[in-house]
Design a protein with these regions (language model features):
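An anion/pyrophosphate-binding glycine-rich loop and adjacent beta-alpha core
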Residues: 27-159, 163
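Short, small/polar residue-rich loop motifs at catalytic or cofactor-binding pockets
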Residues: 57-59, 177-179, 216
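Catalytic phosphate/nucleotide-handling subdomain of diverse soluble enzymes
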Residues: 193-229
Length: 229
């Protein structure tokens, strides 16, 4: 259903047709309010707005900064995560080389927390010229390391935005990414409840991922239930 939103990582065909077909055939939908927004999608130029910027950028040391240059994620650590995420830049940076003895950087909070934080910064007037925030890896790693670890991101920004991420920060913002809700199915077979002969697999099916899908799980969901269907 990503194309229902102004900004999405979904392809052109993500229009919710599968959900509508099942509903019209007598099927049931559940959990359609559970929609996942990936915190880092491209925001410029308009033709590529919403394309994913992989979490590997943050996992390899990239940090989020607002238009004032401030590393703002330290302001958005929920109380429930205080014991697991660093509250200083020094500890957060140490985690990359000593994860056993330091807490994680707040840039690696769950996707929904990071997306809300970015949205809050933009709404507060601390966003980039194109309505996002800065994701910076250029000041964190040598250029040759960036090109080796993040070749697809280097190519993506160079080709689509004329930005060299080894020298410049990226502009990123939340993008509609995945809907956890969908057609109510039998959890063992993928058969749509109430509609004999109808099966749903992948993102069109609901309930497999609760209220917040874990990264990578959608692939196993699609393969397992696609095969069963």
């Amino acid at each position: 259903i990503g194309k229902s939103f102004k900004v999405t990582s979904n392809s052109w065909e993500g229009t919710g047709d599968g959900h509508a077909l099942a509903l019209r055939a007598g099927g049931k939908l559940l959990g359609m309010e559970f929609i996942q927004f990936h915190p880092t999608g491209m925001v410029w130029p308009p033709s590529v707005k919403g394309i994913l910027v992989t979490e590997s950028v943050r996992g390899d040391g990239g940090v989020l900064r607002n238009s004032e240059g401030r590393r703002f994620m330290f302001d958005y650590i929920p109380a429930v995560f205080k014991d697991k995420y660093a509250d200083t830049e020094e500890e957060a940076d140490r985690w990359y080389t000593d994860a056993d003895n330091n807490r994680r950087p707040p840039e690696l909070l769950p996707r929904d927390e990071v997306a809300r934080a970015i949205n809050a910064e933009v709404k507060a007037g601390r966003g980039t010229p194109h309505g996002g925030v800065y994701l910076d890896v250029s000041t964190r790693l040598p250029a040759e390391v960036i090109r080796k670890r993040l070749p697809s991101m280097w190519h993506q920004f160079k080709e689509l935005a004329d930005v060299d991420i080894t020298e410049q920060p990226m502009e990123v913002g939340p993008t509609c990414h995945y809907v956890m809700g969908g057609v109510l199915v039998d959890p063992d077979t993928g058969a749509a409840v109430g509609v004999p002969g109808l099966f749903a697999a992948g993102e069109v099916a609901g309930g497999m991922h609760g209220s917040n899908r874990l990264g990578g799980n959608s692939l196993s969901d699609l393969l397992v239930f696609g095969r069963r269907a």
